A protein has these predicted regions:
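Pyridoxal 5′-phosphate
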Residues: 1-228
C-alpha cells in the first residue's frame, strides 16, 4: 500500500511499528523506535562499524568473525590498522575474555564479536564480554546472525549497545530482512539519506531513530513476515 496518510498506508505503518515493538520486547530493548530494519545482518553490521569508526579509533574482534565484520574493517583501514584480534579458546571462557582484555588499548572504541561462529558453532561468552566492555567504557557490538531466535539474547543484561540480526535464520522471517537494535550510549550517523515519510520539508536527514537510519521505501511485506 505504500506510505502516506491514507487508510492502507497508515495500516501498513502500524504493522511495521508492531514489529518494532515485538523485536524490542524479544531482545530487551526499552524503546521500539530504536529498532532499525535493514536488508540483512551484513547491512546492520556495516551501519554499526562505519558509524563507530567514522573518524578514528580501533575495535577488538575475535578470530572467528564473519566477513560481514572483517570486510568493512578492511575497507575502513587502508594505511591505518583499526582492529586487534582476540583468540577464542573453545571451552575456556576465562581465557577468551582475557584474550579480549589484552587487546584493549587507549584507542579502542568497541568490542565487536559474533555470538556464535557460523563455521565452527563455537559460542562466545557475550555477557562477560559485555561486562568487559562496560568496565573499560567501550561500546559492545554483537553479530547475532546465527543465534537470534535460537539462543537467549538480552541487550540490557548482556550490555549490548548494537545488536545485528538476520531475519531469515533463527527468526524464521523472509530473506532480505534484518535488524539493527540500537542502545542509548552512542548515536550512529545516517548511513543512507533520503525520504523517510517524515519531516519532508527538511533537506537534512531527521535526527531521531529510526528515521535517521531508515531511508526510502521500507520492505513492509518482509517486515510483517518477520513479525509473523
Amino acid at each position: 500500500p505504500g506510505r502516506g496518510g491514507h487508510t492502507m498506508g497508515m495500516a501498513a505503518s502500524r504493522e511495521v511499528y508492531r514489529c518494532r515493538e515485538t523485536a524490542a520486547e524479544f531482545f530487551h530493548l526499552d524503546n521500539p523506535g530504536q529498532v532499525v530494519f535493514t536488508l540483512n545482518c551484513t547491512m546492520a553490521m556495516n551501519m554499526a562499524l562505519k558509524g563507530i569508526l567514522r573518524t578514528s579509533g580501533r575495535v577488538v574482534v575475535s578470530d572467528l568473525e564473519h566477513n560481514a565484520v572483517m570486510r568493512p574493517l578492511h575497507v575502513l583501514s587502508p594505511g591505518r590498522p583499526i582492529y586487534d584480534v582476540a583468540q577464542v579458546t573453545p571451552g575456556d571462557d576465562d581465557q577468551t575474555v582475557e584474550a579480549f582484555r589484552r587487546c584493549i588499548t587507549p584507542f579502542t572504541r568497541a568490542i565487536v564479536c559474533t555470538h556464535a561462529s557460523n563455521v565452527f558453532g563455537v559460542q562466545l561468552p557475550i555477557r562477560r564480554l559485555g561486562e568487559l566492555a562496560r568496565e573499560h567504557d567501550l561500546l559492545f557490538v554483537v553479530d547475532a546472525a546465527q543465534t537470534a531466535g535460537v539462543l537467549p539474547l538480552d541487550m540490557e543484561a548482556d550490555h549490548i549497545d548494537f545488536l545485528c540480526v538476520a531475519g531469515h535464520k533463527g527468526l524464521y522471517g523472509p530473506m532480505g530482512t534484518g535488524m539493527l537494535l540500537c542502545g542509548d550510549r552512542f548515536q550512529l550517523p545516517s548511513f543512507v539519506e533520503g525520504g523517510t515519510g517524515s519531516q519532508s520539508l527538511l533537506y537534512e536527514q531527521p535526527d531521531e531513530l529510526p528515521d535517521r537510519l531508515e531511508s526510502g521505501t521500507p520492505n513492509t511485506p518482509g517486515i510483517c513476515g518477520l513479525r509473523a
